[in-house]
């Protein structure tokens, strides 16, 4: 327990018999409960978990292999039932041993202090850096960082880090039926939390890599995740325009994005665009300039929506 919060850890595991025991046995003492989800393992993971049946703080779930997103969601929902009348923080920690348990206290600290509702681990700002991270992962993380920043309306430098801490307030409002469970799960959470007006903080976590290899096919991954982020980005802005959370920033961002698309699509233009093109400025440049302006307004809208949510919450308590 930390402050007024019980601490739960969600550990998704699929074929992790080589690493899972160490992950469980090195959990910090302040952890009140750990939910280990065996997601269709074909090795000895399930047998290993039987060694912890007598433990009061280790709980296990068995899934048929629904994927890591579904496993994490199941763990969050288990904690909601376990502590339905208590304040708690749910930490996601992979079962592959690539997350340092010593970083957990830094991860939950911003929530305990009341500075945010969600904390994301950031391997790029850790003192040890990301020297252990494979080069292709660094490049992929940088690209996805840009896309996630644009889609969420706030700066995100390590979107793919799965080491996170979530306040129970978020979990009690989350739409579990519509929750994204495929590739891009952490990106979806950031974008959707921005849409709901929750504050996101970042905490340094160590980059640890062993002998594990990823089975992700890069091109299909980028296509699927990129498409999801583009769709969720537009859904986020449209939902604000159609709700009582509309702000001047949102309107200006929508106008700027519209100008950008108008410059890019043939047969659609404005007098200003025709004048700029006539002066030798390429339509693509106009598009990216308009989108850059839109992103600035979008970030302002994101901050305003967060303030509106906090003000509404304060009025409810008054």
Language-model-detected regions and their locations in the chain:
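Cell-envelope/extracellular polymer assembly enzymes that use nucleotide-activated donors
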Residues: 6-8, 33, 188
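Acidic helix N-cap motif at the loop->helix transition within catalytic regions
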Residues: 18-22, 43-52
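A conserved acidic beta->alpha catalytic loop
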Residues: 38-47, 97
